[in-house]
Amino acid sequence: TETMGPCSVNLPDATRIGTVGTPLPGCAIRLDDDGEILVRGIGTFTGYHNNPEATAEAFTADGWLRTGDIGSFEGAEGFLRITGRKKELIVTAGGKNVAPAPLEDRLRGHPLVSQVLVVGENRPCIGALLTLDAEMLPLWLSSHGLEEMTVVDAARDPRVRAALEKAVGRANEAVSRAESIRTFEVLPTDFTVANGLLTPSLKVRRAEAEKRFSAEIEALYTRTPLVPSTTVSPSQD
């Protein structure tokens, strides 16, 4: 709403899937040092009514609007890709800024995976908690010639874990080595609206999930980290 409409768009003759296009005429877009998307132009608002403090927080010192989104530019044409929200940015112990959304989205594309929580704030590396899709699990087991099992049993099954480790490897291909998932755990229960771990719009309540599974997160960092692979098969396991 602060931009009074779109700032970028994919055109019929200039489209890149996965991006929000290039800047529209009259709108300029740049990235801050931490990757936050900054915009300014004829459609950008000038401030909040009778709220100078909020207005000051919304803009940089040189007048660019802070969107709160993290992104990157692709190609010579400058296609903009949004990778996450600044407030969700994870800063590792080594000072690396990691947007969890790209990793979480790629992992949720695996048929076994229901929900993902990427963690790593002030930790030596990035980790993840995965939950299993109870509806897809029987189909996956059958297609892989495995016996029926409950979600709880599947979360402990080494064959299921091996498939998920490959999925983690594929997700890691989208990010740098420093941003890659090096440790993960499969939870025996899913995140749902009913148990308070998903919002009504089905987004993970990150703070609540981190609090409820604090012991599991601590345990992630007591094991030998995975070594990111560059030879993972592109097929779904």
Regions found by a protein language model. Name each.
Residues 23-92, 109:
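Conserved ATP-binding/catalytic segment of the ANL
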